[in-house]
């Protein structure tokens, strides 16, 4: 009993000393601790250094674009022009006629679109890929019975392909996502997509990332190889189709109904050689994943890609997926991740 009392007295004394020490901690020390915690939180964010550099350079690049063109810009123009491979080439490109050369921030592929492109990359003699890229094994999984049985069949039937993709990923620097980890577009949205960036993936529904305010374009294997090697990626300067969303969804209406309605207006070819840029107060009524659904299906009207302006829904999604630091950086340049006010006031 006495031993317990002594221990308790020592504990109380130590606690009091600790309280005094805590009360004398300076504000800078608390700030340093907070910053250290924030730094620790970023350790799980993929390619964080690249993202940090992107947002540090974005305002300067955009300022140079504004100085050269001297006019209000659409969001599409902002994202294209800050990604010019040769910034000095900037001019008033003719939409639908001139070609521009771009430098994407990241790339991706899957187990069907990837193998031939990677084999071509291997002939280049490059030691590593030139930009962050992910490889997702999802297309060779056939949904028939259930996850366990279907994955067993996929692993058995595609063992050589999966082994090859895993090995080259380790050797050349791809992030490899094995079968069963998800559909590539969702994997990208949850782990890689961030507002303002540009991404190339060998899949027609890559524009899903437009729901995150990203310029994401589906490409062929040869285009992917150009990006992996750090070469210029050429694109015909797209036309821009502005779609103003007003009001809010009601009743049984979902985000998918928005793109279905738009598809009926544009037809299956109406978006060819064009980027669909959404704007208006109605955008804020849609979730980030709802926006992603709309952009995903923009491929059905032939659009090069689709994109939404940065808003709070993207902040919430980034926060929910452990990327609050990315959300904070995007918020710092929020006005430049949307079309200029003059454009929204007079889109024509």
Where are these regions (language model features)?
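Accessory "access/gating" subregions that flank catalytic or transport cores
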Residues: 156, 166, 178, 183-197, ...
